[in-house]
Amino acid sequence: MDSPTVFLVDDEEDVRSTLSRALKKRGFQVQSFESARAFLDQYQDDHGCLVLDYGMPDINGLELQSLMNETKLTLPIIFISGHGGIPESVQAMKAGAVDFLEKPFRQGDLVACIQTAFDRDLETREAALAQNAAKARFDRLTSREREIAVFMMENPSNTASKEIGRALDISPRTVDHHRARILEKLEIGSVIELVELSQIVRA
């Protein structure tokens, strides 16, 4: 995985250049944008975080955050603002922002927020990869295997072959055969692991 990037969006050129220069000196990879629209036009779901000015023309910070949430862009956001108040900061945090920093702020505070955001982004992406891998395993199942798997997930304390067979109108021997195939295809060894895998898919 490539190094994470700080995506900096601020309509004031002096703020962009000052912050970009300071962050690069601290070893961060930085991409700067003068507007939310410019960022959206160029962003390719790269990992990192977004340092976002609250009060911008055209699309402001909260509007961009809302748009990203609607379109499932999970890049963590750190708001910076020279005139945002408590209501705005509360709204941003409720919508998932990492933090809301009032200008002027200490560079050390921003750096700490960036590290937190990078950690959150990594966790989110790893969870998405695990979910996709789990879904791919379930896609290996036939319709009958999926039916039996669903029964076992919904009735983890009642997975005897006779009970499953009675519920699905098939023989216990057929249940045993399908159960073995289910565990093999899902790369698991027990009903407990089946339930855990299903929880990953549904997360």
What are these regions (language model features)?
Residues D2-V15, L19-L23, A36, L50:
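Conserved acidic segment of CheY-like receiver
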Residues A180-A203:
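Basic, Lys/Arg-enriched C-terminal extension of HTH/homeodomain DNA-binding domains
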Residues G85, L101, F105-I114:
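C-terminal output helix
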Residues D45-L52, M56:
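Active-site beta3 strand of CheY-like receiver
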Residues E34-S35, N60-E63:
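Acidic catalytic/metal-coordinating carboxylates
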